[in-house]
């Protein structure tokens, strides 16, 4: 029997599940993130790109504040910088192509200002596989990838409903907030909406820009199925990512 208490991701496991895949590289975003007060490069900033076809990619700035992100085929890409305790200008950057995929080089710098309280409400970002809209998701207990069963008899206790761990950027609870302010829902192949109850939220050690969000698999859903999942908090809704059920 195994406890349902969600284990913390290790850096080695994180590297394994988020490892880059080979795909056609069509658009490159690069630039520098600086401290607005000193003008110096700002390290350890997560610059996150969200593509409408190839999903998400993350680059963390080096000690000089430099980053480079290479994206696959997309017609819409948004870019955002995140480091806890900072606000960034621009808040986000978006680019859309009507006649075909976005290509070429796109320089984009960000300027960060230290700010200890939340002043801009931004949607959390669900991480996906490279070149895919499939969520980076794990069985919270077994640490295996999808497709997930709805129930797992190896869990400890009588509640064997599968727990799913999602990886999210720019998502944390502030003073006075509880898990009740987070909602996760999934739309299945029949366009039916299902709630995935939230059970845990915590920072991934060694990656302060990433949190792991643990939810319960939904009730009363036909399988096999594919859920298109979103995370909502503070009136903001994340990008969509898919999770497979068996």
Residue ranges and their predicted role:
Residues 14-28, 34:
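Beta-strand-rich domain onsets/edges
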Residues 95-117:
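Extracellular beta-sheet/turn segments enriched in Thr/Pro/Gly and aliphatic residues
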Residues 65-69, 108, 211-215:
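Short strand-edge motifs at loop-to-beta-strand transitions and within beta-strands
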Residues 52-66, 70:
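Short, acidic Ser/Thr/Gly-rich low-complexity loop/linker segments typical of extracellular
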Residues 52-54, 80-98, 213:
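A short, solvent-exposed loop/turn motif at the edges and junctions
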Residues 27-29, 36-52:
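Short, ordered, surface-exposed loop/turn motifs in non-cytosolic proteins
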Residues 40, 68-78:
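Short Pro-Gly-centered beta-turn/loop motif in secreted/extracellular proteins
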Residues 116-246:
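A sequence-level detector for low-complexity, Ser/Thr- and acidic-rich stretches
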């Amino acid at each position: 029997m195994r406890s349902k208490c969600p284990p913390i991701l290790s850096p080695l496991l994180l590297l394994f599940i988020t490892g880059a895949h080979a795909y056609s590289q069509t658009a490159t975003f690069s630039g520098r993130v600086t401290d607005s007060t000193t003008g110096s490069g700002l390290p350890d900033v997560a610059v996150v790109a969200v593509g409408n076809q190839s999903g998400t990619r993350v680059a963390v700035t080096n000690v000089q504040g430099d980053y480079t992100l290479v994206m696959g085929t997309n017609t819409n890409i948004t870019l955002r910088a995140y480091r806890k305790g900072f606000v960034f200008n621009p808040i986000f950057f978006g680019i859309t192509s009507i006649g075909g995929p976005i290509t070429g080089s796109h320089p984009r710098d960000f300027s960060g200002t230290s700010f200890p309280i939340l002043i801009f409400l931004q949607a959390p970002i669900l991480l996906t596989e490279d070149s895919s809209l499939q969520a980076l998701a794990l069985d919270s207990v077994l640490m295996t990838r999808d497709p997930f069963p709805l129930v797992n008899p190896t869990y400890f206790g009588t509640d064997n409903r599968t727990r799913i761990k999602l990886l999210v950027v720019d998502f944390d609870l502030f003073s006075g907030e509880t898990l009740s302010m987070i909602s996760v829902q999934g739309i299945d192949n029949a366009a039916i909406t299902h709630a995935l109850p939230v059970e845990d939220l915590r920072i991934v050690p060694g990656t302060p820009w990433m949190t792991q969000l643990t939810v319960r698999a939904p009730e009363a859903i036909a399988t096999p199925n594919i859920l298109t999942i979103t995370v909502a908090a503070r009136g903001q809704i994340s990008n969509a990512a898919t999770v497979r059920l068996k």
